[in-house]
């Protein structure tokens, strides 16, 4: 699905142009947090933002929101052995801020969201989509700012996203793979 405003195209599978070592990261439907933890000695989450904010046009479209509708945003860096490996952005529309999602959101703190999502059997994940996100997308610049000069970004980042559903309500989770992800071993430690 092409989104002209940001230039990216979200695909069901990574194209052949995606780096071979990155494809399993883009397509594994299991917990990204668990996958990273199995490949590093120390794992951490650095919360960058957890507040109300505006959405990108493609986030609004995916969640069926009108222009100007706001949402709660959670932006974090996933850290493996002291290196940021993923910039993640979670979106919870204001109209979805009831019940289970709101309790989870308020209580998550600096814990990884993935651990909570995959531990609740009531939560269902919709299929993953992936895209190559470049400088035309605001989220690329959010990732760059989050790194605060700790690493140089390539001209585009591979990302994946999916919607999680709980009692008919949606939470969008997007994960942007930073260059250091390829420094993790292919196989678990």
UniProtKB/Swiss-Prot annotation:
Keywords tagged on the record: Cytoplasm, Lyase, Pyruvate, Ubiquinone biosynthesis
Compartment(s) where it occurs, according to its Swiss-Prot or TrEMBL record: Cytoplasm
Its EC number(s): 4.1.3.40
Binding site residues for substrate: 74, 113, 175
One Pfam family hit: Chor_lyase
Top-level class of the enzyme under EC nomenclature: lyase
Main location as per UniProt: cytoplasm
Recorded GO MF terms: chorismate lyase activity
Gene3D superfamilies: Chorismate lyase-like
GO cellular component, one term: cytosol
Domain of life: Bacteria
Catalyzed chemical reaction(s): chorismate = 4-hydroxybenzoate + pyruvate
Disulfide bridge map: none
GO biological process: pyruvate biosynthetic process; ubiquinone biosynthetic process
Record pathway: Cofactor biosynthesis; ubiquinone biosynthesis
UniProt-listed PANTHER family: CHORISMATE PYRUVATE-LYASE
Function: Removes the pyruvyl group from chorismate, with concomitant aromatization of the ring, to provide 4-hydroxybenzoate (4HB) for the ubiquinone pathway.
Family: Belongs to the UbiC family.
Protein name: Probable chorismate pyruvate-lyase
Upper lineage: Bacteria, Pseudomonadati, Pseudomonadota, Betaproteobacteria, Rhodocyclales
């Amino acid at each position: 699905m092409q989104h002209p405003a940001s230039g990216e195209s979200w695909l069901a599978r990574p194209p052949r142009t995606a780096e071979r070592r990155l494809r399993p990261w883009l397509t594994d439907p299991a917990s990204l947090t668990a996958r990273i933890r199995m490949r590093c000695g120390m794992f951490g989450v650095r919360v960058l933002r957890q507040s109300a904010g505006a959405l990108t046009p493609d986030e609004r479209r995916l969640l069926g929101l009108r222009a100007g509708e706001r949402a709660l945003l959670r932006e974090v860096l996933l850290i493996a052995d002291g290196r940021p490996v993923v910039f993640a952005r979670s979106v919870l529309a204001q109209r979805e801020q009831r019940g289970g999602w709101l309790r989870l959101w308020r209580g998550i703190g600096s814990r990884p969201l993935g651990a909570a999502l995959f531990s609740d059997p009531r939560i269902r994940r919709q299929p993953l989509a992936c895209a190559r996100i470049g400088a035309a997308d605001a989220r690329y610049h959010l990732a760059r700012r989050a790194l605060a000069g700790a690493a140089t970004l390539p001209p585009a980042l591979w990302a994946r996203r999916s919607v999680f559903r709980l009692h008919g309500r949606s939470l969008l989770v997007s994960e942007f793979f930073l260059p250091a992800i390829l420094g993790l071993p292919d196989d678990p430690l």
